[in-house]
Amino acid sequence: RACCTFSQGCLYNMNSHGRVACLDAATGRELWAVDILERFEGRNITWALSECLLVDGQHLIVTPGGRKALMAALDKRTGQTVWTTAPLGDDQTSHCSPILFRHAGRRLITNCSSAHGFGVDADTGELLWTAPLRNPFGTNISTPIYGDGCVFYVTPYAELGRAYQLRADGQGISAEHVWTSPLDTVTGAGVLVDGTLFAAGYKTSKWWFGVDWRTG
């Protein structure tokens, strides 16, 4: 269900049951595979998994949402665990995919669990911030969007779209809610271009949206 990720002659993919595989792109030969739900004691979600995996240097980023890890970095050459992010309460994984960006001199990764948007340090997996993203179905679908120090999370049916300003605070990063939009895109996320967020509405307003990134 998820797109493959290509890096240095290898393809990486996770199937709908949490099996992550590394394939030789030229031959299709499987080089290694790991069940991340089993390794990190996660449970599959109602409509199964569809995370597009993120390659960061020698790391492959996955979001098992298990009792042993909310997020994890695997060695992309072997599948061995490099770092983990501590679980976030009872949160499971979601249908979203992680993104990597730089803010305040740090490399950061953000994604969504079943009930939160969250951000971690890309080098250590340390959990830095969370933002509530609850809805009656207990899952989130749209991949976060980052731009100009803000990150945008959206969940359908409930809290809609919210932007958070990231602020460096000593050794940490906090996320301050700055605006809310009726935009409730559900499966396609959005695109940020020249200060405008473009995306399609779902239940609340079935329109195309162009949202000012600074004001909402």
Please place each PLM-identified region on the residue numbering:
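Hydrophobic alpha-helical hairpins/lids featuring a short glycine-rich hinge
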Residues: 1-36
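Extracytoplasmic beta-rich repeat domains
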Residues: 1-5, 33-55, 67-68, 84-106, ...
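Residue-level signal for tight coil/turn positions that link beta-strands
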Residues: 8-9, 17, 27, 57, ...
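WD40 beta-propeller blade core
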Residues: 21, 72, 118-119, 162, ...
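Short loop/turn segments that connect beta-strands within beta-propeller blades
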Residues: 24-27, 35, 75-78, 121-125, ...
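Eukaryotic tandem repeat interaction scaffolds
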Residues: 164-198, 202-205, 209-215
